[in-house]
């Protein structure tokens, strides 16, 4: 009777109905009796129209499965009432993000399965709320990286599946933890073993995969891989290659090679700064100036046979502005290393000694050659990059910036001062027949022949006051074989040389000239021409007048005498133009027979004074 009353009381309270009313309408619930007599509830929700986790999940649920639904996100603390939850399965949903509060209150959780979702990141810090978690399944998601701090929340795991994601590398801290697995706090009776799934990821096979490759070789006895044959995804040359076939080296931070720390170079020279470093992977090399100014040169990169990286800074023509400190940096993902190289650009006071062919350098070309007042070698200086020549110090001029440019020493008769390749013989044959053409007292023109030169061959002209060291350089456009030097001082002796740009002239390409001689020679020629013309005019004018007068007199005589003149065969009296004993010209009378002879002689315009021949004076007569 008492049993019947109890049943009626339970029915009145609706006990059985209330117990099953906790199961969500879109889910199925089941109750299991465990071996120790306790009960475990399992809730399975697989409705494809489900977009959020159900709100009325029984609090005594031990296993919750939300699978193949349209759930995109899990709000924070959704599962906090499920304090008895031990297994949380969320496979093949549309999850793209998880809250860091999602696992709040799940202190007894041992399994968390999230395969087949769209997770790009995972809230690793949320695992601190699950101290008993042993299984984490994240396969078939979109994870691309694992942060180094994740290692602090994975120490107690015995199963971790990261396969079929977008992982390219693993943090070194995590690999080091796996290589030195220790006894877990909840598995103190036996050694911890970790089952690891890393297959089907696009691994980048470089030095950062060195530790993982060695883990696969069995260095960690407590590490078990679901699939041990991992393959490279990149670089392209290693795509598809198994880890077991790789020969990787351990990563190393950049280490600079010792070298020159200070360079002193003359103005206008070419400077090559070189810096080398080692590292794995090969470091990226770069140059910069300590003062922040831009580089005035070209950077080249090289890799030597031993794997060292080299960078070269080429400064073609250094100036005083290039002086300073240059910083070479070698950098890879492990760090950076720097070194400092100081460059000092100076104006040398003495020439640099070179080995050259002995012998006198300068000699004047042509007749009347004059030996130059130089020793075996001439040391000179030139101003680099002067667009137009300026007057030398011998001629007062307005101060100019161009004139204040520093001069550079070079040795004239040393092959290779400007060029390292062409020989002296080749350069000598290039420029031939150098000549000076006069212009004015302040300018001169040079012409030469270059039969072996091409349309792209450019020449340079070096000139200076004879006997001085300071030389100036002019650049001649490619293809031209003449140039005019302006700004010269009048009545001054100069020396000028023509050579292929970048080469040193030899004595065959040099000429000595004087501005007054050039102009005076041309003026003298003009004066001679004028004197010759004047003398010819003076000599030819009197005979011409005499001939005209004689013709006029004959005509008058004809008119007077009529036909008697023809009968006698005589003409008017002729005058003799000869030389008197004192050398002066005189006029005299002659006979008619002598007149006939003179009229048949050569024209008076061609007559000349023949001088004294055979001891007696020879006179020629004109009319």
From Swiss-Prot:
SMART domains: IG, IGc2, LRR_TYP, LRRCT, LRRNT
Domain of life: Eukaryota
LRR repeat ranges per the UniProt record: 60-81, 84-105, 108-128, 132-153, 156-177, 525-548
Tissue specificity annotation: Retina, outer segments of photoreceptor cells.
Species annotation: Rattus norvegicus (Rat)
SUPFAM superfamilies registered for this protein in UniProt: Fibronectin type III, Immunoglobulin, L domain-like
Ranges in the topological domain labelled Lumenal: 22-526
InterPro entries: Cys-rich_flank_reg_C, FN3_dom, FN3_sf, Ig-like_dom, Ig-like_dom_sf, Ig-like_fold, Ig_I-set, Ig_sub
Subunit architecture: Homodimer. Interacts with LRIT2; may form a heterodimer with LRIT2. Interacts (via its N-terminal extracellular domain) with metabotropic glutamate receptor GRM6. Interacts (via its extreme C-terminus) with the scaffold protein FRMPD2 (via the third PDZ domain); the interaction leads to their colocalization in photoreceptor synapses.
Signal peptide segment: 1-21
Location of the Fibronectin type-III domain: 430-518
Protein encoded by which gene: Lrit1
Location of the Ig-like C2-type domain: 266-332
Protein's name in the database: Leucine-rich repeat, immunoglobulin-like domain and transmembrane domain-containing protein 1
Domain LRRNT intervals: 22-59
UniProt topological domain (Cytoplasmic) ranges: 548-623
